[in-house]
Amino acid sequence: MNINIVKEKIKLHKYYLITIIIMFIIIIVLGFFLLTKENNTFTNPYEVKVSPNDNFLFLGDSITDFYPLEEYYDNLPVVNSGIAGNRTIDILNDMQTRVYQYNPTKVFLLIGTNDLDSSTEDIVDTTFDNIKEIVKEIKDNRSDATIYVESVYPVNSNVENNSVNNRTNKKIRSFNKKVSNYCDGDNCIYINLFDDLTDEEGNLKEEYTEDGLHLNSLGYVVITRELLPYLNE
C-alpha cells in the first residue's frame, strides 16, 4: 500500500476523532447549561415572593370574592383573596396560597359569617378562636404586615328570598364585640363596618343588599368609603 495513502487515512481518522471529541464536549456543555437554567427557573411553592411595592390583600369569603376591588380602588395595589363559601377554618388550612404567597404589606380580613350560619352553641367562641389564630399566623410569618380585621356585616332576614339562614345580628354583634376587644390589645386594627350598614332596627339596610346577606353595588360604595383611608395611610 502506498505510504501516502496510509498517511492520508491516518490524518482522516484523526480528523474524525477530533470532530467526535469536540461534538461530545459541546453536548456536555449544552446539557449542563440547560440543566442549570432549569434549576434556576424552578419555583418553590413555599418560597416567599417578595413584592417590591405595597400589596394590599383582601382576605375573606364571598363578600370579598364578589368585591370588584380594581373598580373601587383604582391605581392601588389591591389583591382579592376571597373565596365564596369560605369559613375561618378554610383560610387557616390554606395560609400559603391565600396569604403568604402575596407577601402583603396590609391585610384586610373579613371572615366569619359562614361560620355563624351554624346553630352550634359555641360557634361564636370557635369562630373567634380561629380569627385569633389567623391573625397570629400572619403576624408570625409576615411580621411587617399591618392587619385590619373588619366586623362581620349585618344581615336582614326580612328581605324576600334571603340567604340569611341561621345567622342572626345578635350572634354577629356578640362575635364582633370579641374581635373588637381582641384588636384593642394591639394585635390588629379593628374596623367597625357593622354600624355603617345597619338600619334603625339594626338590620342590614335593604338598599345595600339583594338577598339580606351579600352586598350590592351601593353597599360596596359604603364599604369602600370607609376602607379607603386605611389603604391610603
Per-range role (PLM):
Residues 154-233:
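Catalytic His-Asp segment of secreted/periplasmic serine-dependent ester chemistry enzymes
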